[in-house]
């Protein structure tokens, strides 16, 4: 796949952006040290060529970047300000043992991760010392995949793996003491005990005033079929 990657230094080179956009190929634009006004103008120029296939990269223009400086929350800021474009992270921090920063970036919404790469950080040259070595890339990908897995879909509800614990850990309404047939139920006759496979405590008020149709022993669950009006 042919993609143009525009470094942060060129975000104000509007003639370059115009030319690149005219090829109608996807563009990845880094935004390090750029103001919102500069980003807006760059986007305007690119869109002006009819090219909307654009991704914006959060970036700190510092080689290397200290761990306190990436400001990863910018990923969320860019996503909120520019909802029509994919957002990624261009990361210049030093590789750590578990490659945490790229994974956190993904957790915050980054869809693209850019890191410098080298065969060895001992090689001479300005960018090698903070670049990823092959083993680092493997760790980074593994950690990112783990983060993607644990993030889930964000839907709140009862997951399949929670059903057993939900049933066993929650409580049901039971008789606080022996309840004789024909008794009108009052609140003091009831208490809550595990497991949660009976009537849920949040329905206790529905039981008050109902008449017991049979004897219910202490600690036995109250069942709807044992009651009448």
Where are these regions (language model features)?
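Catalytic cores and adjacent flexible loops of soluble metabolic enzymes
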Residues: 1-229
């Amino acid at each position: 796949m042919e993609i143009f990657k525009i470094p942060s230094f060129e975000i104000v080179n509007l003639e370059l952006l115009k030319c690149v956009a005219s090829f109608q190929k996807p563009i990845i634009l880094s935004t390090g040290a750029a103001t919102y006004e500069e980003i807006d103008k760059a986007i305007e120029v690119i869109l002006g060529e009819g090219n909307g296939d654009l991704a914006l990269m959060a970036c700190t223009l510092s080689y290397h970047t200290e761990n306190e400086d990436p400001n990863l929350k910018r990923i969320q800021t860019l996503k909120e300000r520019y909802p029509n474009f994919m957002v990624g992270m261009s990361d210049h921090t030093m590789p750590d043992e578990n490659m945490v920063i790229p994974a956190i970036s993904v957790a915050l919404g980054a869809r693209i991760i850019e890191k410098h790469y080298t065969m060895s950080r001992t090689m001479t040259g300005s960018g090698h010392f903070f670049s990823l070595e092959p083993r680092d890339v493997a760790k980074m990908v593994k950690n990112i995949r783990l983060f993607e897995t644990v993030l889930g879909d964000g839907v709140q509800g009862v997951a399949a793996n929670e059903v057993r614990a939900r049933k066993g850990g929650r409580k049901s309404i039971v008789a606080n003491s022996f309840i004789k047939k024909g008794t009108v139920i009052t609140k003091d006759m009831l208490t809550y005990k595990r497991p949660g496979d009976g009537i849920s405590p949040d329905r206790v008020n529905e039981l008050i005033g109902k008449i017991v149709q049979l004897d219910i022993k202490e600690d036995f669950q109250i069942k709807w079929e044992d009651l009448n009006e």
